[in-house]
Swiss-Prot record:
Residue intervals annotated with topology Cytoplasmic: 1-212
Native source species: Xenopus laevis
Name this protein carries in UniProt: Regulator of G-protein signaling 9-binding protein A
Taxonomic placement: Eukaryota, Metazoa, Chordata, Craniata, Vertebrata
Function, in words: Regulator of G protein-coupled receptor (GPCR) signaling. Probably acts by regulating the activity of some 'R7' family protein (RGS6, RGS7, RGS9 and/or RGS11).
Ranges that cross the membrane: 213-233
Length: 237
């Protein structure tokens, strides 16, 4: 039961961290707005709440000497995944801080970047918050005020990760993966290969091979023509 609870918490953190990264990538773009900055703040806070819950559960579990060898190996694997999520979250928080400083909303220093993206980001934020719709209630200067909070939270995140390493030492290279690299992606591709509009991995590979062959033939033909022309020029001269 505890194992399933840890997996559920980790899945939730994974989802929210992914949504946060998606939102961070839109800072400074044409989709940037006050609503986006509020979505970033709420999503970041949700991720930190889940991070604390994951840390508490996994730390107390891994310090339990009654764990069997199999259970310990599984929880260590979950710990490594959790640590990776934390690294990603901290990296994205730092990126959000830099971009937020470069692209303030009310006193713009630079023009917004034409990224090609359009539309709002409320759907992504709502998914992270597990809500149907987002409610916006932030002040107009959230783009400036939140940067101070974000900077403090980055420092707290670093302290939290340091404390984690001191309490539980699980070297990543000692944990064995349960699947081969890319196994999950391959299973998703094979499962969706029969769906309409989805090209299978093998078909995609065949198309790529055909394109390479065609490119090689065209290049060879151009090279031969160039050689013939060069010979003709030499003879005529």
């Amino acid at each position: 039961m505890l194992k399933e609870e840890c997996k559920a918490l980790l899945d939730a953190l994974n989802k929210v961290t992914g949504c946060y990264r998606h939102l961070v990538l839109t800072i400074g773009g044409t989709s940037d707005s006050q609503n986006l900055r509020e979505e970033l703040k709420k999503t970041r806070q949700k991720a930190q709440e889940l991070a604390v819950a994951n840390r508490n559960t996994l730390t107390s579990t891994l310090k339990d000497h009654r764990l069997t060898k199999e259970d310990k190996a599984e929880f260590e694997r979950l710990w490594v995944i959790f640590s990776t999520c934390m690294d990603i979250l901290e990296t994205d928080m730092r990126r959000a801080l830099v971009l937020g400083q470069e692209f303030p909303l009310n006193i713009p220093k630079k023009h917004l970047i034409q990224t090609g993206m359009s539309g709002g980001t409320s759907g992504v934020a709502a998914r992270a918050m597990s809500a149907q719709n987002m409610r916006y209630e932030a002040e107009h200067n959230i783009d400036v005020m939140d940067l101070k909070d974000l900077e403090n939270e980055i420092n707290l995140m670093g302290e939290m990760m340091y404390e984690m390493e001191m309490k539980v030492s699980v070297p990543q290279w000692t944990v064995e993966a349960k699947q081969d690299p890319g196994a999950e992606l391959k299973s998703i591709m094979s499962a969706g290969a029969s769906s309409p509009g989805i090209i299978s991995l093998d078909a995609h590979k065949s198309i790529c091979d055909l394109s390479k062959i065609l490119a090689g033939v065209v290049f060879s033909a151009v090279l031969i023509i160039a050689i013939v022309l060069a010979v003709c020029v030499v003879k005529l001269s």
